[in-house]
């Protein structure tokens, strides 16, 4: 089963490289198992929101910050594994 990961990031802030890095890390960890999409906001929002199958699992807007630590990455990977039924 393909798991959908959607990332909304601040396009006005130049966060696209952060999205690309996250996408690459997740594709390396879960090859051919994810459908990853990204959406840059046209204005400066400061957002970096990660949804797994429609469920918000990481939100910079709500205080999670960037995905810049192993524990933050693990939270996203755990949500993906749960969505896969692992």
From Swiss-Prot:
At what sequence positions does the UniProt record place the cross-link Cysteinyl-selenocysteine (Cys-Sec)? 10-13
Family note: Belongs to the SelWTH family. Selenoprotein W subfamily.
List the InterPro entries hit by this protein, alphabetically.
Selenoprotein_Rdx-typ, SelW_related, Thioredoxin-like_sf
For this UniProt record, the keywords arranged alphabetically read as follows: Antioxidant, Cytoplasm, Redox-active center, Selenocysteine
Q: Which GO terms describe its molecular function?
A: antioxidant activity
Does the record's keyword annotation contain Kinase? no
Q: In its UniProt record, which GO terms are filed under biological process?
A: response to selenium ion
Instruction: Name one cellular component (GO) term.
Output: cytosol
Cytoplasm: present as a keyword of the record? yes
The protein's location, in the record's own words, is: Cytoplasm
Gene3D superfamilies in UniProt: Glutaredoxin (3.40.30.10)
Name the encoding gene, please: selenow
Q: Know the name of this protein?
A: Selenoprotein W
Q: Which purpose does this protein serve, as stated in its record? A: Plays a role as a glutathione (GSH)-dependent antioxidant. May be involved in a redox-related process. May play a role in the myopathies of selenium deficiency.
């Amino acid at each position: 089963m393909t798991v959908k990961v959607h990332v909304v990031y601040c396009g006005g802030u130049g966060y696209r490289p952060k999205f690309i890095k996250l996408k690459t890390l997740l594709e390396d960890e879960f090859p051919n198992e994810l459908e990853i999409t990204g959406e840059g906001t046209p204005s400066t929002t400061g957002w970096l929101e990660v949804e797994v199958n429609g469920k918000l699992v990481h939100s910079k807007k709500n205080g999670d910050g960037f995905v810049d630590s192993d524990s933050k990455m693990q939270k996203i990977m755990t949500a993906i594994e749960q969505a896969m039924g692992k």
